């Protein structure tokens, strides 16, 4: 797998998954023969990795905040940096009950994790029916009681929420995709207006969907934070925190 920096690690993960063993087991039993059928499957999966298909899509899952989430090419692969949204949710909301909506949920990793970590009533939304199917399967496998709704941002959503969390597409269409991200859904990566279009639309929608003193928690490229902060300020949101890729806003007192 020339040209892939993590080739050895990726091969071990794929082989361990195929054999249904741990990587530790592989290291301890390196001389054991491999069943011909298992070897054939492993080699086919390694060929996919040579084509730069992400490991998470090959093995069908990805770890996020200590839990295993199913993924496929209809959803973005959860990133470690997105865990900061959960950490900041805990820090700025605490253990209070409330209503949270995860907009553009994809695999459901943010909303499901929030539901399992805190006493929140959670709704997952996505414009993609296929993504919602994956989120529903993850909610079921992790025993998370959540509601699901297909919606373009909050356009088809009624009611108001204490917390809106969103990892929306924020990559500029001018960005050159890596071989791996070339396999991820463009719908989950790219947005117009240098990556800001969907985030700005969601900020506009907080006026009718976010309660006073409620939180808006977003992920965005740090280079976009100033523009997002200025836009949010003009719409009644005060910046509460910046943490890596995570932005936290609080809604000031006004009519909802």
Language-model-detected regions and their locations in the chain:
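Conserved SAM/SAH cofactor-binding pocket of Class I
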Residues: 80-178, 201
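Conserved AdoMet
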Residues: 16-88
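Residue-level detector of well-ordered alpha-helical segments, enriched
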Residues: 7-11, 41, 198
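Non-catalytic nucleic-acid substrate-recognition regions in nucleic-acid-modifying enzymes
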Residues: 1-7
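Conserved Class I SAM-dependent methyltransferase catalytic core
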Residues: 194-251
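Mobile active-site "lid"/loop adjacent to the S-adenosyl-L-methionine
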Residues: 168-198
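Short alpha-helical
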Residues: 21, 77, 129-130, 197, ...
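Flexible, glycine-/basic-rich loop-and-beta segments that form/coincide
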Residues: 253-256
